Amino acid sequence: MDNIRNIVFDFDGTLMDTAPLILGTMKATIEKLGLEPHTDEEYRATIGLRLEEIPAALWQATPEVGKLYAATYRRIFNELKQSFQIECFPGVIDTLKLLNADGYRMAIASSRNRKSLQEYVDSFDISDCFTMLVGGDDVFQGKPAPDPVLKILGSCGWKATETITVGDASVDILMGRAAGTATCAVTYGNGTMEELLSSEPTFMTDTFNALRPIVRGVNPEIVKYVEHSIIPRYDDFDKAHRRDHVRMVIDQSLCLLRRLPELNIDMAYCIATFHDLGLVDGREKHHIASGKILESDSFIRTYFTEQQIDIMKEAVEDHRASGKTKPRSLYGMVVADADRFIEAETIIRRTI
């Protein structure tokens, strides 16, 4: 994944949690038109299609019904949207800004019309992160056809081989694959696991935060293990050392690695994720305990050599910003500097 320079995102269910508003609007539209009701799961399965295509998917309806449905939906949507609080999924805004700072070029390919898409992007102050927005009304064929991604690639001059498409539904993954890009399915949105697996994405992730390590080239299996088995352990620590802290250390470590391309990114990532786990035994010697936890981790031992594990253990032990001795390796310097970088933001919390 070290060749990835461009990222194309889906919007609904990937960046923003719009499902309550969409489902509410769908149900009101269906009732208004006297159509046969379906289950929420069946409604969710149509998110990602253009509005005009939904009646055909749910009721095998004619194109004329599709046009009527779309017009009714848009009118009801505008009436209801002020009643729903739309939020970004956890980690979206921070990760987008970090990816932007990393130099990745980003765009959105959505089935919603571009005016609505632009309004939401502007409302969350993330428009500067994107080179281009493509709505369902900008292309002749919508998802799962490749047209939205191809329009972005052509307009921006991006290569498909340097691009990854990220989405929560099978139509997003199929769109990206048809356009020749790598793909990443996020599992927290509207698509079911069965649907996502059947679309054969290049990668899958349960959290948006994990996307940055993946596109930076960290082994996706390591990212998955860390997200499921390591980061949740920070929930038991004091307020200054919970998930937000370890994620900041990870993010800052990845930033520092831009200037140190000779370092192994998998090693640096794991060092950052393990650096404070020793707090489970108290703060005084937590850096030593953290090193032992990393060294004895069975998953880590399947991915790294003994020499690499020794270096990683030393780096974890050397991470303390208040330590009097110089880190023994560049890896130790990276995690120490990453931890020290955020110290100013957390020093007050750490002394309470």
Q: Model-flagged regions — what are they?
A:
Residues 47-80, 90-93, 97-98:
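A metal-dependent, Asp-based hydrolase signature
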Residues 1-45, 59:
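Active-site neighborhood of HAD-like aspartate-dependent phosphohydrolases
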Residues 1-7, 97, 114, 118-220:
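Asp-based, Mg2+/Mn2+-dependent phosphohydrolase catalytic module
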Residues 38-42, 65, 128-132, 160-164, ...:
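Short acidic capping loops at alpha-helix termini that bridge into adjacent secondary structure
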Residues 218-285:
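Acidic/His-rich, divalent-metal-binding segments that scaffold phosphate/diphosphate chemistry
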Residues 29-30, 50-64, 120, 152-153, ...:
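Helix-loop "lid/cap" segments that line or gate small-molecule binding pockets
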